[in-house]
Structure formats: structure tokens, C-alpha cells
Amino acid sequence: VERSRGLGDVYKRQAYEQDLIDKAEPVLQQWMTRVRQEGLLTPRVAYGYFPCGRDGNAVVVFDPEERSKELGRFELPRQRSGNRYCIADFYRDLTAEGGPSDVIPMQAVTMGEIATTTAKELFAADRYSDYLYFHGLGVQMAEALAEWTHARIRSELGFAADEPQALRDV
């Protein structure tokens, strides 16, 4: 049963949105300006494609230069109900002819050492509000970079042709 919204709910929502405009937005803009001026965030990303295959519930990753050399494996859980899928199920079995013939993309993102140092300094100086604002901004920027990288990888692998153009819609 859908609850109808009363006038009080509408006023609460409007007050909340006004608080965002009056209070939160200026703080965000202040921090974004400071981050740009002082170079507090230094976004970096590294990603690559590695040969891989499935061994039971594990995805086994191999060296791209020496395809028989195992770099590591990810033992993954299987769903406890429903179809009982495991992420490894979506990779080609290593017992198939030709060895590792699937690919797994790997990525890492960072906002840099300066961001880490700045957050620690704010916390140590008991500037908790500033610490939380800066830390939150850094985390959101790292997440956005990870999402952007993921979209790029999907595009490079040809999976993105039918996906929305706007990142927020992916």
C-alpha cells in the first residue's frame, strides 16, 4: 500500500532541499576550490587486461607475457539459493582446449598520497568537520574515477554499445 504524502512531508522535503542549497552546496564549493588550488587530490588510475580462466569457484589469473605462469587466483563464493551462481561461472573453464583464453580486467584508483596526508592532518588537528568533508569528497572522487574507468574498460571490450551514454545511467 502506497502512503500518500501529506503537506508536512512536502514542506520537510522543501526545507531539506533548501538546506542543501544554503548550507551544503557552499561547503562543497569551498572544498572543491581548495582542492583545485592546493592540488590536494591527484587522481591516478591503472588498469590492464589479464588472461584468465575458471577452476571450480576460482578465477585464475595468468601473466600476459607468459600465459602458463599463474599470477594468482580469486576463490569466490557461490550463491546459497536461486541459481547458485558464482562469478567464476562466467569465465571459460581452464580444462577447455587451449588453456586460459578468457580475459579479466583489473583496475586500481587513487586520489594520491597528498589526500591521505591531508586527511590525517585534519583529523590529528581535531578539525573533524573539515576531515569529514574532505574525506567524503575524496572518497566520492575515487568512486567516480573507478566508475569512469569501469565504463572505459567496458567500452574497450565492446560491452558498452547498448549502454546509456550518461555514466549515472550505466
Locate the predicted segments by residue.
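Charged, low-complexity helical/coil segments in non-catalytic cytosolic or luminal regions
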Residues: 142-155
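Active-site loops and adjacent core secondary-structure elements that bind or stabilize anionic groups
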Residues: 5, 9-132, 136, 157-159, ...
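Short alpha-helical basic/polar micro-motif
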Residues: 139
